[in-house]
Design a protein with these regions (language model features):
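Extracellular glycoside hydrolase catalytic/binding regions
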Residues: 1-109
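Aromatic-rich peripheral "rim/lid" segments of glycoside hydrolase catalytic domains that contact
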Residues: 16-23, 50, 85, 89-181
């Protein structure tokens, strides 16, 4: 019974309290700063600081819900486009790296203080895939880049060449493994 969080439930906490009984082991949530219009990749300096504050508040709300239900919480989908929303694998990722580090720090801080945050799953592993530069959306025979076919290919992809992002993800994995339950 995965959930996007309260945004996917008309901004109501009831999606958790009504659907997560004793047979559900943990809660999930998404954080989509671009899709939810909290962040504009064409104006990152203007919009990223406010987006981070919205993320902080949204996460705190879900932590409180998880606490009230005595369940762990996983940020199971989140992503941020490459700089200037480029889909090209070798384009810069400095904004995404900044955002990932911010979100990972919030998750780690909560987990290391015995809060309900138990982990996260970034969206999405693109690996060695390459988006077709002649069209935006996936087509038969195209590489898989992690993004669904109805979204621009490479929009949220983490490619094998994204060394700085992969380093941030690896550090978060190591930090979370060291957290004692």
């Amino acid at each position: 019974t995965g959930s996007e969080g309260t945004i996917g439930c008309l901004d109501s906490d009831d999606c958790y309290t009504d659907a997560h009984g004793v047979d559900v082991d943990y809660l999930t949530m998404h954080v989509w700063i671009k899709n939810w219009n909290w962040f504009d990749p064409q104006r990152p300096e203007e919009t990223l600081p406010a987006a981070k504050e919205k993320v902080r508040a949204y996460l705190a709300r879900h932590v409180a819900i998880a606490d009230s239900l005595d369940k762990p919480l996983v940020v199971e989908e989140f992503g941020c486009p490459r700089d200037k929303e480029s889909y090209v694998p070798d384009s810069p990722v400095s904004i995404r790296d900044d955002y990932f580090k911010f979100l990972f720090d919030l998750i780690y801080e909560n987990a290391s203080n015995r809060g309900p945050l138990a982990g996260s799953n970034f969206w999405a592993w693109g690996g060695y895939g390459k988006p077709d530069q002649d069209r935006t959306y996936w087509g038969p025979g195209d590489d898989a880049t992690g993004d669904p076919p109805q979204e621009p290919q490479g929009l949220y992809s983490i490619f094998a060449s994204d060394a700085t992002t992969l380093e941030i993800i690896q550090r978060q994995g190591q930090a979370m493994r060291a957290v004692k339950p």
